[in-house]
Amino acid sequence: MNSEGLAVIETNSTRMEFSDVQHGSIVSLVDKRTGHEFLRTVKTATALWEATLVMTEGKKELSASDARRFRVETTKIGKRGTRLTMTWSDFAKPFQGVSVVTTVEYECPDSQVKFRLLRFEPGTEVGVWHVDFPIVGGIGEIGKNEEGDELEIPLLQGLLVHRPLTTIVKNEKVNHTSYGTYPGLLTMQCFSYFNENVAGLYLASHDGLGCRKDFVFDSDREGNGRFRVRNYPENMGFKGRNYSSSYPFVITAFQGGWAEATEIYRGWATRQAWCRKGRLSQRSDLSNWFRNTSLWVWNRGNADRVSPGPIELKKKTGVNVALDWYWWHHNPYDVFVPEYLPPREGALTFAKAVEKLHAMGTKVVVYINGRIWDMNSGSWDEQRASKAAALDENLKPYEEKYNIFMPENVIAPMCPTTQLWRDKISHLVSALMEDFHLDGVYIDQVAIATAELCHNPEHGHPVGGGHYWVHGYNDLIRTARDGARKANPDACLLSESCIEQFIDSFDGFLTLDSSWERTGANLDLSWDKMGLQGQTWEPIPVFNAVYHDYAITFGSYTSMTGVPPYDDLWPESGRPREFGKFATYNDKYPDQFAFELARTLSWGIQPMVTNVYPEMLGREEFDADMKFLEEVAKFHSVAREYLTLGKWLKPPEVDCPCVAVKMYIRSIYTAPDRISEMVRNSPAVLTSTWTTHEGSVCVVLVNFTRDPVNAKLAMDLNEYGFEPDDRITVSDYPRSGVQTALPSHKLEKTVNLPGRSIVAYEFSAK
């Protein structure tokens, strides 16, 4: 503790000060490289931790500032590290038995600063419900008037929020809060708040087990930014049970933007258990046909509507095509799950349709949901499903509703640790694979939905918090995958969204982020409230930046038609009046389809198109979209070494015009009178960069507009893994056979891209 009553942690990049007077609150956080102070001076500093505790009379709040005794001890770690140990005790009744110990440390001057909740002792008559730790308040703007300030959130593939203090902290429409759950919609544990021209702050938990936690960016008492992590102990609320988090939290300053922050996270993440099978190029357990697919068709309905689209696209493109088939099942979509069998057209008709698709060279994957059971279904009572349901703190099943056309149906998430649910899904997968000779099963929701806090004491797992949800589903998936492989040794299991915890269990992940604007109306994630027209957010490929060479992603929601399908098993009264009428929105939104498809390719995602039905085939108004789809699929097919197996690199600077892409927002449950639109400003040319582990680098430029574009490409190849004395050659890609030696490692090149075209260059060292 220095003369000013401050305990200091100082690395080469970061200086933090903790106030003795304010019970260990972080009162200064400085990027040492630039001298930027991230925290504003406040009247009352934010407590380093807050807790909700349980007593006989109910729940009460407690924080570090309530302690009447606080002490800090500074010790050395090894030769060059430092650890601060902070202890809070002597709380007023009824918390007189509470004692809390945390540490803040670094191992050497070049390392990150790690926070640990070492021990939370509640005393004999108190239980710990949850603990918010660490908490950093007083966060201010980085750039002047927030110009250039960004917040990266690992929501699905990734979300970039512009001017986050204005967009979130000062925004009453979102209750001054951005909140997410991991595992769940938050697919990783790394956040970054940065201004590329000034400094950045990396905020993450490094938890290899997958414990349930919530990340919150909100407002402190004085209207500044605040970042906190809510941690849920095993056996929540049990009196006398001490709590220690099994994972550290990392807060450190860095230089750059979200790409540089992902490199920090990748250094930890790719050493975790979910990457233990190695990079994609090293893995022998993945489905080969899935690895080599370059075009997906997502269709819904009976065979005569579903099959012609993928068959026609297979003929047109010649690439490996796969069908993701929805609404093949007995039950109406999103209700009466998991009563999928028999197929709604009958087993024989369905089997013949699969056989025909195979004969035409198309792989077939069918949809099921791997997480929920409809409490209105007959099987709920017959199979005593309530015993396997995840229960809330009142020992009632969590309740959800999805189908707006059948709102009386209530859905319950199931607990993956229960044998009933494991058997239900694994037996269903085996039956589908054995009876219908499928190529795989897409298991919805498992990788996207919240890891519920299950309070059922009969399930055998810790009550409430912990990592049992992830481990339960990993066991379930592996069992189901083993069963599928008995019927088809090259079968794949896929799931919705992308999440690190299931990388080594699922073969791949369906991600729709390249069509995020289109699907926004179907998800209650508040981005419409964040000023959709104001360009306050945009999707970014954070997950693929970290894991592209470890996990395969596929998908988009892009469609050439403006009318979503309507399940024939839903009530006729809810059918939109335009259903069954052919409609295209290409005249009003001429660039949306190509923009979403270009994003998909640029992010290294296997391309997908949705809702390709017989009435669309051969129509002149779709010729341009079909031609671009064909070009994208063919390019992906020849570039799989980069676009499926390669490591993502930060794209170089490309100077090109910016265009306004007019987009409509409509998902499957969007009524005709609820359709909305927005404008997304984007460079006319989307750029991505990839490397193989042999060291070659490929730069891909995609012009999604209808007009030719001249783009100026500038690269310093020393920033892409090449050594200063390397002799570098460049060639067109796919390889033309002509290699040109570069006179310098700094490349400046004007690239002429025709409308809706792809140009790529490959760089190699001699």
Where do the PLM segments sit?
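Acidic-aromatic substrate-binding/catalytic surfaces of carbohydrate-active enzymes
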Residues: 4-94, 103
